[in-house]
């Protein structure tokens, strides 16, 4: 698949120890062997490239740092509201709200950056870093307003960058783009590279769509 992580085999590697180091469940080791058609698991030549589905990779939640902030911005986390300042960090599950003159820039675990515009409500659903690579698994929910993103190249890292809105889903690897949500109208502007946007019919949940 397009979002597979490419792992380069080192001396002494086997499907078993790769699984124990980097994957979510030990149950993946026979699947890893099958997926890559490994005939002799104990004698994989160093330098061999193995494909690992992104969904199998173990990851850790990472804080997101605010590198710039203007005007009034608050975060709601576990029912508690707090005014934000530059240099502070937020975590998965945080809901951001900017005022009419408010904006902020987020530095994400994989080095991607997101500029959250005025009059915007944005939930940071997922902010994780893959243990096997520098790739990030990022998911945001844009409830209203706009967010402009400069995303690091996620090809071969197992990384994903998803923005979910009431009107659709936008997914990307390695580009710069802006997403605006206004009354169930989704507008995606590509500033550099390519993105994929998927419209969601009223009353239905969106499926995650990856750029390929």
Report the location of each language-model feature.
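Flexible, surface-exposed loop/linker segments and immediately adjacent secondary-structure boundaries
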Residues: 45-49, 55-212
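Extracellular LysM carbohydrate-binding repeats and other cell-envelope/extracellular binding modules
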Residues: 2, 21-61
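Disulfide-stabilized cysteine-rich extracellular repeat microdomains
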Residues: 12-14, 37, 49, 121
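Internal amphipathic alpha-helical segments of the cytochrome P450 catalytic fold
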Residues: 15-16, 29, 41, 113
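Primarily a LysM-type cell-wall glycan-binding module
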Residues: 2-23
């Amino acid at each position: 698949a397009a979002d597979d992580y490419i792992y380069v085999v080192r001396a002494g590697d086997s499907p078993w120890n790769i699984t124990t180091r980097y994957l979510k469940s030990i149950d993946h080791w026979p699947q890893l062997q099958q997926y890559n058609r490994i005939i002799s698991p104990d004698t994989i030549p160093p330098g061999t490239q193995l494909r690992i589905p992104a969904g199998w990779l173990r990851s850790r939640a990472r804080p997101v740092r605010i590198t710039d902030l203007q005007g009034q911005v608050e975060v709601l986390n576990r029912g508690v509201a707090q005014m934000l300042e530059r240099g502070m960090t937020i975590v998965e599950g945080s809901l951001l709200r900017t005022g009419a003159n408010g904006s902020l820039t987020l530095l994400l675990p994989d080095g991607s950056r997101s500029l959250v515009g005025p009059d915007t409500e944005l939930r940071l659903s997922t902010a994780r870093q893959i243990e096997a690579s520098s790739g990030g698994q990022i998911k945001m929910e844009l409830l209203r307003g706009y967010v402009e993103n400069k995303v690091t190249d996620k090809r071969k890292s197992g990384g994903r960058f998803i923005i979910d809105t009431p009107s659709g889903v936008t997914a990307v690897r390695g580009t710069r783009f802006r997403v605006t949500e206004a009354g169930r109208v989704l507008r995606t502007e590509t500033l550099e590279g390519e993105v994929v946007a998927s419209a969601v019919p009223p009353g239905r949940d969106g499926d995650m769509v990856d750029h390929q």
